[in-house]
């Protein structure tokens, strides 16, 4: 019996020593294990060689980076971001279907960098660009139905700084889509509605102090604004594509009439919340081009 207990004690001691030996070996292994290599700062080329970005990808990234300033000149803060997002969405869809057209838009963007660094030169180019966008939107349908030849469309592209346009006509509905987003109810209606609600009281209080001609112009301006609001208020989720198109053309025509009537009273436009910069001359939606505008319009 005593011999058995002695043998058990020796076995237990041997097991404990073996366990300690194993734990020590594991600790030594962990200490000797090399630390992981730092992540490489370069991407290893695959079997086909280094990856190259397509010209369309490069042009698209550059275009998205440069177009935001354009929308900042049309809108303030939140609405500028909204317009930028709409533009990027349209351009991403275009890039998937027609990457070469994105490159053409990039050439237009590069043309902006050639106009000079002074403020006057930049403003002239911005005005030119806005007039061109308006012309594309207003005349998109007419151009598509006119059977314009490839040579004529190429010349039109060149007028936009797209020297190597390949004659694809898909740019026209794309630009019309962008303009539809910029002249949408979400963008225009809140500010216009606020002005139209304040306009009657303002007209009544300034009737005696304004020249008759100016008073009549403000009355007409108020009437046109009300018509634009009525167009937006008539929108329904079930509107057909034909109805939406007709409404857009009507809103664009009314906005052009507003431009012809000049600025609204500062007391009204100045009270608008952050959003639309109601500067119709700056928007330059259409109307008779000036000396510089004659070189910008391609229609």
From Swiss-Prot:
One of its GO terms (biological process) is peroxisome organization. The keyword Cytoplasm applies. The modification Phosphothreonine is found at residue 236. PANTHER family: PEROXISOMAL BIOGENESIS FACTOR 19. Necessary for early peroxisomal biogenesis. Acts both as a cytosolic chaperone and as an import receptor for peroxisomal membrane proteins (PMPs). Binds and stabilizes newly synthesized PMPs in the cytoplasm by interacting with their hydrophobic membrane-spanning domains, and targets them to the peroxisome membrane by binding to the integral membrane protein PEX3. Excludes CDKN2A from the nucleus and prevents its interaction with MDM2, which results in active degradation of TP53. Belongs to the peroxin-19 family. This is Peroxisomal biogenesis factor 19. It comes from Pongo abelii (Sumatran orangutan). The gene is PEX19.
């Amino acid at each position: 019996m005593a011999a058995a207990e002695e043998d058990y004690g020796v076995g237990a001691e041997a097991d404990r020593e073996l366990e300690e030996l194993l734990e020590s070996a594991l600790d030594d292994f962990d200490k000797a294990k090399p630390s992981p290599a730092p992540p490489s700062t370069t991407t290893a080329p695959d079997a086909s060689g280094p990856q190259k970005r397509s010209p369309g990808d490069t042009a698209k990234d550059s275009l998205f980076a440069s177009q935001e300033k354009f929308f900042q000149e049309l809108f303030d803060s939140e609405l500028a971001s909204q317009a930028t997002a709409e533009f990027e969405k349209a351009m991403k869809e275009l890039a998937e279907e027609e990457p070469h057209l994105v490159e053409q838009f990039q050439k237009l963007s590069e043309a902006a960098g050639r106009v000079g660094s002074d403020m006057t030169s930049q403003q002239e180019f911005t005005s030119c660009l806005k007039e061109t966008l308006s012309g594309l939107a207003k005349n998109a349908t007419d151009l598509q139905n006119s059977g314009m030849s490839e040579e004529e469309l190429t010349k039109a592209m060149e007028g936009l700084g797209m020297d190597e346009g390949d004659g694809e006509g898909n740019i026209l509905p794309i630009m019309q889509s962008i303009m539809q987003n910029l002249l949408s109810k979400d963008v225009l209606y809140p500010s216009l509605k606020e002005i139209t609600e304040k306009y009657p009281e303002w007209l009544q209080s300034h009737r005696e102090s304004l020249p008759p001609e100016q008073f009549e112009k403000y009355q007409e301006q108020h009437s046109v604004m009300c018509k634009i609001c009525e167009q937006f208020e008539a929108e329904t989720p079930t509107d057909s594509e034909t109805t939406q198109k007709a409404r857009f053309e009507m809103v664009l025509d009314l906005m052009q009439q507003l431009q012809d009537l000049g600025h609204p009273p500062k007391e009204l436009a100045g009270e608008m919340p952050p959003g639309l910069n109601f500067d119709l001359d700056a928007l330059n939606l259409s109307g008779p081009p000036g000396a510089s505008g004659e070189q910008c319009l391609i229609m």
